[in-house]
Amino acid sequence: MTRDLTITAVHLTPILVADPPLLNTQGVHQPYTPRLIVEVETADGVTGVGETYGDAKYLELARPFAAKLVGRQVSDLNGLFTLADEVAVDSSRVFGQVDVGGLRGVQTADKLRLSVVSGFEVACLDALGKALGLPVHALLGGKVRDAVEYSAYLFYKWADHPEGVASEKDDWGAAVDPAGVVAQARAFTERYGFTSFKLKGGVFPPEEEIAAVKALAEAFPGHPLRLDPNGAWSVETSLKVAAELGDVLEYLEDPALGTPAMAEVAAKTGVPLATNMCVTTFAEIQEAFTKGAVQVVLSDHHYWGGLRNTQQLAAVCRTFGVGVSMHSNTHLGISLAAMTHVAATVPDLHHACDSHYPWQSEDVLTERLAFDGGKVAVSDAPGLGVALDRERLAFLHRRWLDDDGTLRDRDDAAAMRVADPEWVTPSVPRW
């Protein structure tokens, strides 16, 4: 039977989801963070779902982009990029701007468009898979593994958000010293079975973070460890940390900011360097690889424009002998399912992927994805293998509607100023 894959409707639902007080070099996570849920409906009544960033700058592009999709085929994945190029980007969103957290370098119109396209591409793949009775990984060429390994994503963390700030309670407790970090790692292991650990650094002086990693190495001997200060260190400091931790680190992630600084660090240490900051588009690959600045690229389908571009990135990395794994920002189950499907198709995935998912107490799915032994099983159900919980989606959307605009754009520095009114985003290198 021929299926009618014509897109008849696209629904965009911005939401606010609870986020714990996780610390980074920019500040602290807000009590709620914005996400955008994308739904694509076909003439046959099939609905596909996707997820991406929900900040205003992405919504401004997603709305006109969604209108252009109606009447097109859900299978026209290449056409998504052509359509995205037709959507104008407000120059104030990109001129001289650095994205929140500085995680992608200088913001560009193309980077904004790719993040929007990623959510729609996943939704189209989900719908196409459901229509054909095939899982997304089959549409991507087939899986090479039945489960994808993830690492425990450790953060320095306050016990609660500042007093007087509306927020959801969590049971993780505080982690502001080596003992707290180790306790957090043990909790991750007990709950989810993780066997590798990543610590978000750039929060405290390097000596304190070195002590935390050494404490992890003592508590979990032989387990892969990573440290990520988000470019907060100078080249000199990066080299000192690498010398101190070289015998326990799997890799050091973005110790210094930018490709030239990373290349200088890489030239003077044997510790592999990973990045999700200086290689976030195809245009940034040549300089980084030519200069030997990175040994592992942490892909993120929200950055790169979707799952198929993620596969292309993995192929380029394989060609140049550069490792590949996956970066994570705050996300829900739709994105974790998408990550798992594409990760299952990448042959040379030699490092556990990152995921914030354990930190998110809320979701929009009828059933949360589960970690078993630190891994997520690859679904063989049609599409992504997930289903929306309409009541939860409506609840989280209502929270977004009720917000006065304060939380509709992620701003870790603004969240920190609630606790410390004198806080300013630190200049880099911070140490």
From Swiss-Prot:
GO terms for molecular function: glucarate dehydratase activity; metal ion binding. Substrate binds at H29, T108, Y153, K198, D228, P229, N230, N276, H327, S328, N329, H356, R410. It is an enzyme of class 4 (lyase). Coiled coil: none annotated. InterPro entries: DgoD-like (IPR034593), Enolase-like_C_sf (IPR036849), Enolase-like_N (IPR029017), Enolase_C-like (IPR029065), GlucD-like (IPR034598), Mandelate_racemase_C (IPR013342), Mandelate_racemase_N_dom (IPR013341). It comes from the Bacteria. SMART domains: MR_MLE. One of its GO terms (biological process) is D-glucarate catabolic process. Mg(2+) binds at D228, N276. Pfam families: MR_MLE_C (PF13378), MR_MLE_N (PF02746). Its EC number is 4.2.1.40. Its cofactor is Mg(2+). It catalyses: D-glucarate = 5-dehydro-4-deoxy-D-glucarate + H2O. Belongs to the mandelate racemase/muconate lactonizing enzyme family. GlucD subfamily. This is Probable glucarate dehydratase. It comes from Streptomyces coelicolor (strain ATCC BAA-471 / A3(2) / M145). The lineage of its organism: Bacteria, Bacillati, Actinomycetota, Actinomycetes, Kitasatosporales.
